Amino acid sequence: MQFLSSFVFAALALLPLSAMAVDEAASEIASSTKPASTNGTLSFCLGVKHADGTCKYTDDYLADFEVLAPYTNMIRTYATSDCNTLEYLLPALAQSPYNFSAILGVWPTDDAHYDLEKQALMQYLPQYGVDHVRAITVGSEVLYRNDLPADVLAERIYDVRGLVQQKLGFDVPVGTADSWNLWAGGSGDVVITASDFIMSNDFPYWQGQNTSNMTNTFISDTLAALERVQSVKGTNNVTFWVGETGWPTDGPSYGEADATVDIASEFFQEALCNIRRKGIDIFFFEAFDEDWKGDSSSVEPYFGAMYSNRTLKYNLNCTSE
């Protein structure tokens, strides 16, 4: 949802499943991804700016990792050159005592920006290595925003993979992240084919779902995306993450969805913990509030699991069974 404005998801939402159907769907997910005894991991999308909009440096990332360490050791970012992300993030990953890794992002638009992104990869990956680089995403919700046609995005995924794996010689998987409905609806098939992995983003808040429907909606959306990825790949053995999901804790309502700490906590416990128990790895959007994005007239600054001062909003340990 980085750089995402409040577009309407509601018309694209699948009908919520019954509780029994959701349980069956989640069981299918588990059998398709990991052994049933293996819980999915919790990771966080991490912004590269302070609350005032200034860029983070290595010490700032180290401080982020320290407060995130009880819950995860993996984060994802969205660009390599913006805020000189790689220059300061890669040393932090290497220095942190908590063994953090990252899924790095490459922003594929516009052409000049894209060139800067690749230059950052060429400069800093050889310098710092990839021991703490789990994967690379080329774009985030590029198809959803119509930033690039699917075939052009696929070409840029191949381009970055060639740069990283062939030219630089690093065995790092390359894929992308987009809204669940773009995968489920089939318009991203050529991108699925091009990708080593797929991330599916899903925000029931932006579908206007209330507390009665948010969990069922999230699980049914995720299953629909996963099934399409498996179909296109021709195998159930795919690398698939929930790339972004979360719930705002302040700001205006959207349809029947209210933005409160209590509902965000409920969404975490009911939807996210449920799907993790079935073996799906998730990236929570996001680690910290990003105050620089706006004010109380928007929910965009308030998706953090923690406030911008790095204090926790609600329990991030799964408690319900």
Curated annotation (Swiss-Prot):
It is found in: Secreted, Cell wall. GO terms for biological process: cell wall organization; fungal-type cell wall beta-glucan metabolic process. One of its GO terms (cellular component) is cell surface. It catalyses: Successive hydrolysis of beta-D-glucose units from the non-reducing ends of (1->3)-beta-D-glucans, releasing alpha-glucose. Pfam families: Glyco_hydro_17. One of its GO terms (molecular function) is glucan exo-1,3-beta-glucosidase activity. Glycans are attached at N39, N99, N210, N213, N237, N309, N317. Its EC number is 3.2.1.58. InterPro entries: Beta-glucan_modifiers, Glyco_hydro_17, Glycoside_hydrolase_SF. Residues 1-21 form the signal peptide. It comes from the Eukaryota. Keywords: Cell wall, Glycoprotein, Glycosidase, Hydrolase, Secreted, Signal. The active site is at E141, E244. Belongs to the glycosyl hydrolase 17 family. Glucanases possibly play a role in cell expansion during growth, in cell-cell fusion during mating, and in spore release during sporulation. This enzyme may be involved in beta-glucan degradation and also function biosynthetically as a transglycosylase. This is Glucan 1,3-beta-glucosidase. It comes from Schizosaccharomyces pombe (strain 972 / ATCC 24843).
